[in-house]
A protein has these predicted regions:
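Structural helix-boundary/capping segments
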Residues: 1-14, 25-30, 34, 90, ...
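Short helix-loop capping/hinge segments that flank enzyme active sites or metal/cofactor-binding pockets
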Residues: 1-8, 55-110, 122, 126, ...
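Acyltransferase
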Residues: 18-42, 65-71, 95, 99-116
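Short glycine/threonine-rich loop-to-helix capping motif typified by GTGT followed
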Residues: 18-20, 49-59, 130-136
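Short connector loops at secondary-structure junctions
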Residues: 36-53, 82-86
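Short, surface-exposed loop/helix-turn segments at secondary-structure junctions
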Residues: 97, 129-150
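Small-aliphatic-rich amphipathic alpha-helix that forms the alpha element of a beta-alpha
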Residues: 144-167
């Protein structure tokens, strides 16, 4: 293949668990023999990327939920309220800086794609966790700054606005499904899908790299009584007082 690939475990600014780094390195090693070039890429990101995303996200939440926050704050969940509250503390100077910095980030990605056809990274920084946990509270021993901080491997790509997808790619050392994040050139959605399909087909015959398939026989019998109410978000199997029976369907 003539494909030129740049890879990064963490974009230089994202915490990532050791089990994910190990799984990612295995996939990179598998790529090296199939492409013309596979080397580390430095996108020159700094911790400012997190602040940029905080500001732009808060700005979007204020636009969407500002009126509800002012008139009926009790109608919003705690995470939405936290995002809107963050927005109320942001200045015009903060917004101007964030938009300029986002442009700089987009240009760094554009420069990288002058050399590479594809950039790969992990999708998430942690192995899949229990559905009863709403988000990862820490990554690699680092406490999360907020409920979405653990998604930084993908939101730094969102800042660049490049197309990206998750390619299911075997399992990690814990036996949990692993995803490879594939990032393409700006407006290169079709080319990205084509590269993803080629990789998926190339690895389809390798049990360690192929898309994990659920064991339907093992899942056929539920370990819990599916007739019981399922709360969402999970409340340790209980329904909040006065809330009624909230179900998953």
């Amino acid at each position: 293949s003539s494909l030129k690939v740049g890879f990064t475990e963490d974009f230089g600014v994202c915490p990532v668990d050791a089990v994910v780094r190990e799984a990612f390195r295995t996939r990179v090693a598998a790529l090296e023999g199939r492409v013309a070039l596979c080397e580390p890429v430095d996108l020159a990101l700094t911790d400012d990327a997190h602040r940029v995303f905080d500001i732009l996200r808060a700005e979007a939440f204020l636009a969407a939920y500002g009126e509800a926050f002012r008139s009926a704050p009790e109608s919003l969940g705690p995470n939405v309220r936290a995002n809107v509250e963050m927005a109320t503390a942001i200045t015009l100077a903060d917004r101007a800086w964030a938009h300029l910095e986002q442009t700089r980030i987009a240009r760094r990605f554009a420069r990288a794609f002058e050399r590479y056809d594809l950039i790969v990274a992990p999708v998430t920084p942690v192995s899949p966790f229990s559905w009863t946990e709403l988000y990862a509270t820490e990554v690699d021993g680092v406490p999360a700054r907020n409920y979405y901080h653990w998604l930084s491997l993908t939101y730094v790509v969102t800042l660049a606005t490049n197309p990206a997808l998750s390619l299911p790619c075997g399992r990690d050392a814990r036996g949990m499904p692993f995803g490879l994040q594939l990032i393409g050139r700006l407006r290169g959605d079709v080319a990205l899908l084509s590269m993803a399909q080629a990789l998926e087909q190339a690895w389809a015959g390798d049990a360690a790299l192929a898309r994990p398939v659920p064991d339907l026989a093992a899942l056929a019998r539920s370990a819990v009584d599916l007739k019981a109410p399922v709360t969402h978000p999970p409340l340790e199997g209980k329904v909040a007082a006065g809330a009624g029976a909230a179900t998953a369907v």
